[in-house]
C-alpha cells in the first residue's frame, strides 16, 4: 500500500510550489534596477516583470506600464511567459490528478492499483511543471547576467535579479521535490513465487519380484 504520509507531504510541497509559480508570474519584480554605480540617483526604483514595467518613487507613488505590443518583446521574455503559463496549467492538471490518487481521498477505493497509478501520474506532471518553471526562470536569469556584464550595456541600464525570480526558483524546487515524493510513494512490486506443492510418494510394491 502507498505511504499516505509521503503522499500528503509531496502533494503539499508541490501545491505550495504551484502557488509560488502563480505569484512569481504575476509580480513585476523579475529584474530590478542596479545601483552598482555611485552616480546613480536612488530616489526611484525601477523594475520589470513579464507583463509590465514599474517605477517606484521615494514618496511611495508607483507607476506601471503594461507591455502593449507582443511582437515588440524580445524572444527571452516571450519564451519565459509561455513556459511559466505552461507550468501553471500543468500544475493545475497535476493537482486534480494527484488528488484522485491520494490515499486520504475516497475516490477509486475499489481499485487500489489504479489509484496508486493516478498519484504517480500526478507526480510526473508536477515534475514536468517544475521543470518548465525552472527552465523559464533560469533562462530569464541568464539573460539578466549576460546584459549586466555586457560592456556594451550602459551602466544606467543594468538590472539585477528581482524578488519574483527568487520566488520562481523556490516554486520550481518545491514542484520538483513534491512531484518526486509523489512518484516515490508508490510501493515497489514484490516478486511472488508459487508455493511448492509436495508430490505424493509412490506406494511401496507389495508383490514379489520374479526372475
Swiss-Prot record:
Disulfide bonds join 54-64. It comes from the Eukaryota. GO terms for biological process: bicellular tight junction assembly; calcium-independent cell-cell adhesion via plasma membrane cell-adhesion molecules; cell adhesion; cell junction maintenance; establishment of skin barrier; positive regulation of cell migration; positive regulation of epithelial cell proliferation involved in wound healing; positive regulation of wound healing. Residues 1-7, 103-118, 185-211 are cytoplasmic. InterPro entries: Claudin, Claudin1, Claudin_CS, PMP22/EMP/MP20/Claudin. It is found in: Cell junction, Tight junction; Cell membrane; Basolateral cell membrane. The chain crosses the membrane at residues 8-28, 82-102, 119-139, 164-184. Keywords: Cell junction, Cell membrane, Disulfide bond, Membrane, Tight junction, Transmembrane, Transmembrane helix. Residues 29-81, 140-163 are extracellular. PROSITE patterns: CLAUDIN (PS01346). One of its GO terms (molecular function) is virus receptor activity. It is a multi-pass membrane protein. Residues 192-211 are annotated as: Disordered. Its main location: other. Residues 210-211 are annotated as: Interactions with TJP1, TJP2, TJP3 and PATJ. GO terms for cellular component: apical plasma membrane; basolateral plasma membrane; bicellular tight junction; lateral plasma membrane; plasma membrane; protein-containing complex. Can form homo- and heteropolymers with other CLDN. Homopolymers interact with CLDN3, but not CLDN2, homopolymers. Interacts with MPDZ and PATJ. Interacts with OCLN, CD81, CLDN4, CLDN6 and CLDN9. Claudins function as major constituents of the tight junction complexes that regulate the permeability of epithelia. While some claudin family members play essential roles in the formation of impermeable barriers, others mediate the permeability to ions and small molecules. Often, several claudin family members are coexpressed and interact with each other, and this determines the overall permeability. CLDN1 is required to prevent the paracellular diffusion of small molecules through tight junctions in the epidermis and is required for the normal barrier function of the skin. Belongs to the claudin family. This is Claudin-1. It comes from Bos taurus. The gene is CLDN1.
Amino acid at each position: 500500500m502507498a505511504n499516505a504520509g509521503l503522499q500528503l507531504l509531496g502533494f503539499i510541497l508541490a501545491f505550495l510550489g504551484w502557488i509560488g509559480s502563480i505569484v512569481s508570474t504575476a509580480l513585476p519584480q523579475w529584474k530590478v534596477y542596479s545601483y552598482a554605480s555611485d552616480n546613480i540617483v536612488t530616489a526611484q526604483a525601477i523594475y520589470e516583470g513579464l507583463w509590465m514595467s514599474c517605477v517606484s518613487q521615494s514618496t511611495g507613488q508607483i507607476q506601471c506600464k503594461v507591455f502593449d505590443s507582443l511582437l515588440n518583446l524580445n524572444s527571452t521574455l516571450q519564451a519565459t511567459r509561455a513556459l511559466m503559463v505552461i507550468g501553471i496549467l500543468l500544475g493545475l492538471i497535476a493537482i486534480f490528478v494527484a488528488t484522485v490518487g491520494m490515499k486520504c481521498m475516497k475516490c477509486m477505493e475499489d481499485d487500489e492499483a489504479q489509484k496508486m497509478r493516478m498519484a504517480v501520474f500526478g507526480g510526473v506532471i508536477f515534475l514536468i511543471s517544475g521543470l518548465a518553471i525552472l527552465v523559464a526562470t533560469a533562462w530569464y536569469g541568464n539573460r539578466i547576467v549576460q546584459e549586466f556584464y555586457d560592456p556594451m550595456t550602459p551602466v544606467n541600464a543594468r538590472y539585477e535579479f528581482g524578488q519574483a525570480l527568487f520566488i520562481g526558483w523556490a516554486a520550481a524546487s518545491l514542484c520538483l521535490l513534491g512531484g518526486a515524493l509523489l512518484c516515490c510513494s508508490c510501493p515497489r512490486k514484490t516478486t511472488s513465487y508459487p508455493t511448492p506443492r509436495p508430490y505424493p510418494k509412490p506406494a511401496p510394491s507389495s508383490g514379489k519380484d520374479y526372475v
